[in-house]
């Protein structure tokens, strides 16, 4: 049996504990008025906020702040006190620097679609437990990443830097990274040290860069022993890369390049590879046995290649017919010769390969006869193709011409200044080529900052017009023979030339066509006699028509008075003539006009007379007032114009 005193003590203790815990509970469940809170998820997105609201609950785990206008000044310092926050969504805001004051234990940070330019060690060291960092669609460049910025990011597994301004792979990335996305930047080269140590990397995406075979080191991917997916889509490769890591690589994407050759050892030891895509390239044949090591291949996609179904492709037919059902091969359709065009290689008979044909496409190694060749260093703008001490460099005039070598002209380039911001580039090829890489750079600019502009032109073209240049500025133009028709060109040495645009003023045309076009408005050409006579007749005819129209308009009233009926009259004209004439006659209205018929020749008396109206046959109604006591009585037509029925002499 509990005594009353002891019961009172227990009740008081419970009340005290409740009073202490209640404020904390209320504070934990508070929510900013502009947000919505739901069990640790704070929804403040799409609210046009310029700063992160205060009063976020302490038990928050995920902050949705995307699609606002939050800038760096709008991140409060007390945000770092939210120790339970693990995910922050700040994409599509107005950040121009990597944000600070973030919660220490955040693991997932979304900063896409801002304008972030710099990444510093100070900002990353305050969030050491970060595992996923997404920086797509920002303005990050290689020089804006501080050296050693990631040295304390020992838990970082995923780094997305797609669609930025990178010209090289960032140095010093943590070894823990498993997925690295660098697509749609301007990376021309990848050296072995840049990826050295990334032994945990499983997925590497390098789509849409400026990579060619010279820009890839010999064994740049070889040490990535855990790599399972490699994507090199939309680059400038002319041959499939070699020395790929064969231990775990399962997916390889090489589509949308300029690959016209596959080295025999390109896919050696890739026994785990099950998906290979080489669509949209320039492959016409494949070396025999190229797929022998692909033990686990199940998806082989080779669409949109100019396959030449000659004798060298007969082995492919035999290989396809021996594959198990689980292997899915797409895109092996003949494009040449014409007799098998559009047919699947797998369905061809042995006789159709025509192995005795002397015109079979073959792959031959060729080297260009260019003496004293200077090979460009990596990450630098390529030097001129030859050293010729006895020949002076061309002066910076409007027109220039250069060739690959006096002994053998591989490419001959001619550049002409067309306008103050346009140059015309033309070239001649000594060898048939499938594609060339044309690039231009304003002199005085560093290639590291993305000022090089490149484009791929087909071998059939012989000229190109470059626009949107700066007036009165020097430029360097280079061309690289990427490949030749059915041949592989190992030496991709550029041929360069310097030129300058015209000053910004009234441009004086330099071409004969432009001169003729400018002079043409001031010429007095001899017109044909028939044209002169026809023009004179037309002018006289127009003048006569104008005179007739003027005369008819002037005498229109006279003509109408001579007619008994005038259908074009208006009702108010009838009223005006009928109500003002004084005559001892009867007013007859016919159609829309009238006629005064005299009754006798007697003089008009001064007595009051009444004009009796004869209604016309067209149904026009006249509303008449029967009150005739006063001379001021009036009746109104339906048009509102007064009509006097009584008049006094």
Curated annotation (Swiss-Prot):
Q: Which residues lie on this side of the membrane: Cytoplasmic?
A: 550-649
Q: Where is this region: Interaction with ADGRL3?
A: 38-67
GO annotation, biological process: cell-cell adhesion via plasma-membrane adhesion molecules; embryonic morphogenesis; fibroblast growth factor receptor signaling pathway; head development; heart development; neuron projection development; neuron projection extension; proepicardium cell migration involved in pericardium morphogenesis
Q: Where are the LRR repeats?
A: 59-80, 84-104, 105-126, 129-150, 155-176, 177-197, 200-220, 226-247, 248-269, 272-293
**Glycosylated position list:** 226, 282, 296
| Membrane topology qualifier | Single-pass membrane protein
Name the Pfam families on file: LRR_8
Where does the record place Basic and acidic residues bias? 389-401
Query: Would the keyword Disulfide bond be found if you checked this record's keyword annotation?
Result: yes
Record's keyword annotation contains Secreted: yes
Top-rank taxon: Eukaryota
Q: Which residues form the Fibronectin type-III domain?
A: 409-504
Which Gene3D superfamilies does the record cross-reference, listed alphabetically? Immunoglobulins (2.60.40.10), Ribonuclease Inhibitor (3.80.10.10)
Disulfide feature: 31-37, 35-44, 309-334
Q: Where is this region: Disordered?
A: 385-407, 622-649
For this UniProt entry, which segments traverse the membrane? Answer: 529-549
Which GO terms of the cellular component aspect does the record hold? Answer: axon terminus; axonal growth cone; endoplasmic reticulum membrane; extracellular space; focal adhesion; growth cone membrane; plasma membrane; synaptic membrane
- Give the Extracellular membrane side ranges: 29-528
Give the subcellular location: Cell membrane; Presynaptic cell membrane; Endoplasmic reticulum membrane; Cell junction, Focal adhesion
Q: Which UniProt keywords apply?
A: Cell adhesion, Cell junction, Cell membrane, Cell projection, Developmental protein, Disulfide bond, Endoplasmic reticulum, Glycoprotein, Leucine-rich repeat, Membrane, Repeat, Secreted, Signal, Synapse, Transmembrane, Transmembrane helix
Q: Any signal peptide, and if so, which residues?
A: 1-28
Subunit record text? Monomer and homodimer. Self-associates (via leucine-rich repeats), giving rise to homooligomers. Interacts with FGFR1. Interacts (via extracellular domain) with ADGRL1/LPHN1 and LPHN2 (via olfactomedin-like domain). Interacts (via extracellular domain) with ADGRL3 (via olfactomedin-like domain); the interaction is direct. Interacts (via extracellular domain) with UNC5B and UNC5D (via extracellular domain); the interaction is direct. Identified in complexes composed of FLRT3, ADGRL3 and UNC5B, respectively FLRT3, ADGRL3 and UNC5D.
Function recorded in the entry: Functions in cell-cell adhesion, cell migration and axon guidance, exerting an attractive or repulsive role depending on its interaction partners. Plays a role in the spatial organization of brain neurons. Plays a role in vascular development in the retina. Plays a role in cell-cell adhesion via its interaction with ADGRL3 and probably also other latrophilins that are expressed at the surface of adjacent cells. Interaction with the intracellular domain of ROBO1 mediates axon attraction towards cells expressing NTN1.
Protein known as = Leucine-rich repeat transmembrane protein FLRT3
| The species this protein was found in | Pongo abelii (Sumatran orangutan)
> Which classification does the entry list for the species?
Eukaryota, Metazoa, Chordata, Craniata, Vertebrata
Identify the coding gene: FLRT3
